[in-house]
């Protein structure tokens, strides 16, 4: 079994062993390692950017807060506008400005998202999924921020439509995919067009995880992290990382 770094990935390994005909983990151990790495980066790094687009801009904040107010706070006897204000303040304080994204660094945060879209769009222009004609655990990792955030919320969705149509096609293809009906396998080796993603992981995400580990060891619930010209202050640690 490939080395995994969190409980979520352990569960996926167990699922893969029990359902070999629906495998999402490459049998090649090198492929599997890099697929797990992409899955972790996609799921644990990009949620902050997703929350920024959801709650920073008025269009996204009104869209999300109304949905949450109607779904989660329906039993509370308050006007819908009051529930929306509460939710917007709560989410911004907890997940955007309250988690290190400020007016000083949001330009770079958004540029990084555009860079991600550009890299993914080139990949999905050549093939259906990250490692070939079959979805892998890496695709599942990216489905988290894309299914529920980037391709759902109005602001990032419009950016994807304009800048990365192949990514939007991938979202639809992955959603409709039935593993038991796919006879194609993963490509051999590591596709060259994944290199920009791994470069970004090495330059930003791995140092971020290292700072995260130090915070866990020191029992600090928040930590500071700097990358490029961004200074994340009081970022929350990821408690499921295994040291």
Segments from the language model and where they lie:
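Buried hydrophobic packing segments
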Residues: 15, 38, 145-149
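GST-like fold's C-terminal all-alpha helical module
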Residues: 47-241
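Short, glycine/charge-rich beta-strand/loop segments that flank catalytic centers
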Residues: 25-39, 52-60
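Short, polar/flexible loop-turn hinges at active-site or ligand-entry regions and domain interfaces
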Residues: 20-28, 156-157
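N-terminal G-site helix/loop of the GST-like fold
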Residues: 1, 18-19
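Short, thiol/selenol-centered motifs that function as redox-active sites or metal-ligating centers
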Residues: 1, 13, 35, 134, ...
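Single conserved hydrophobic/aromatic residue that forms the stacking wall/gate
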Residues: 2-14, 242
């Amino acid at each position: 079994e490939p080395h995994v770094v969190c409980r979520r990935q352990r569960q996926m390994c167990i699922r893969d062993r029990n359902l070999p005909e629906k495998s999402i983990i490459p049998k090649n151990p090198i492929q599997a390692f890099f697929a797990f790495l992409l899955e972790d980066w996609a799921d644990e790094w990009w949620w902050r950017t997703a929350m920024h687009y959801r709650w920073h801009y008025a269009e996204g904040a009104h869209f999300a807060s109304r949905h949450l107010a109607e779904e989660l706070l329906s039993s509370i006897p308050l006007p819908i506008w009051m529930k929306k204000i509460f939710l917007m303040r709560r989410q911004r304080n907890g997940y955007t400005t309250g988690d290190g994204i400020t007016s000083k660094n949001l330009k770079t945060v958004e540029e990084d998202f555009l860079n991600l879209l550009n890299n993914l769009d080139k990949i999905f222009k050549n093939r259906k999924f990250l490692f070939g004609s079959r979805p892998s655990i890496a695709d599942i990792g990216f489905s988290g921020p894309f299914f529920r955030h980037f391709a759902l919320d109005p602001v990032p969705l419009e950016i994807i439509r304009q800048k990365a149509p192949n990514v939007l096609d991938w979202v639809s293809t992955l959603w409709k995919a039935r593993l038991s009906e796919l006879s194609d396998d993963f490509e051999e080796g590591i596709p060259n067009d994944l290199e920009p993603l791994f470069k970004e992981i090495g330059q930003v995400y791995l140092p971020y995880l290292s700072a995260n580990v130090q915070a866990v060891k020191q029992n600090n619930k928040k930590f500071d992290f700097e990358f490029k010209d961004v200074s994340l202050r009081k970022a929350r640690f990821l408690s499921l990382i295994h040291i």
